[in-house]
Amino acid sequence: MMAAGPRTSLLLAFALLCLPWTQVVGAFPAMSLSSLFANAVLWAQHLHQLAADTFKEFERTYIPEGQRYSIQNTQVAFCFSETIPAPTGKNEAQQKSDLELLRISLLLIQSWLGPLQFLSRVFTNSLVFGTSDRVYEKLKDLEEGILALMRELEDGTPRAGQILKQTYDKFDTNMRSDDALLKNYGLLSCFRKDLHKTETYLRVMKCRRFGEASCAF
């Protein structure tokens, strides 16, 4: 039985994901640059929180506590996104231009669209896992938001950038297999890490451009 605190957090994350983001996306052309950044940061934050909560619930449910540290130091936990030149934290992100950070964010988002599209078929008996279709929709919306920012910064004529041809594997539906559990555990860990990177990059860009007092994070 989950504690009240984590379940409340998960319910809140799910409620936030149900907000009418598509209305915002449809209004992108008429929005100011500051509003575009504000909305992109907000939804990256929501998705990162849900990714973290999903990872934690999976870990509590399927991975014995004594095995967690050793598993995360194996090839299972390796994220192929680590092979692209993506900053690993705020300080490194500040050395990149806004367009560079947007392109990297787009690569990270697009690498998950395939694996997440059918995630709900894997986790059918959980409140959080069952929201994966919603996560896919919101990830698509965030992709559109990032593309809108790129159009604004490139004066409406986006240039061709790096193409990430490799994507993550699909989640394994055979939850009775130890190999499948380890694979899914590694994928959820990578999803959490990649969403954290995306949120960090967007927050760095927003704070750098608009110098808000709340930029500390």
From Swiss-Prot:
UniProtKB keywords: Disulfide bond, Hormone, Metal-binding, Phosphoprotein, Secreted, Signal, Zinc
Disulfide bonds: 79-190, 207-215
InterPro entries, sorted: 4_helix_cytokine-like_core, Somatotropin, Somatotropin/Prolactin, Somatotropin_CS
PROSITE patterns named in the record: SOMATOTROPIN_1 (PS00266), SOMATOTROPIN_2 (PS00338)
Presence of the UniProt keyword NAD in the record: no
CDD domains: somatotropin_like (cd10285)
Main location per the UniProt record: secreted
Binding site for Zn(2+): 46, 199
UniProt keyword Iron-sulfur, yes or no: no
BP GO terms, sorted: animal organ development; growth hormone receptor signaling pathway; insulin secretion; positive regulation of biosynthetic process; positive regulation of growth; positive regulation of receptor signaling pathway via JAK-STAT; response to nutrient levels
Gene Ontology cellular-component terms listed: extracellular space
Function: Plays an important role in growth control. Its major role in stimulating body growth is to stimulate the liver and other tissues to secrete IGF1. It stimulates both the differentiation and proliferation of myoblasts. It also stimulates amino acid uptake and protein synthesis in muscle and other tissues.
Family under the similarity heading: Belongs to the somatotropin/prolactin family.
Protein's name in the database: Somatotropin
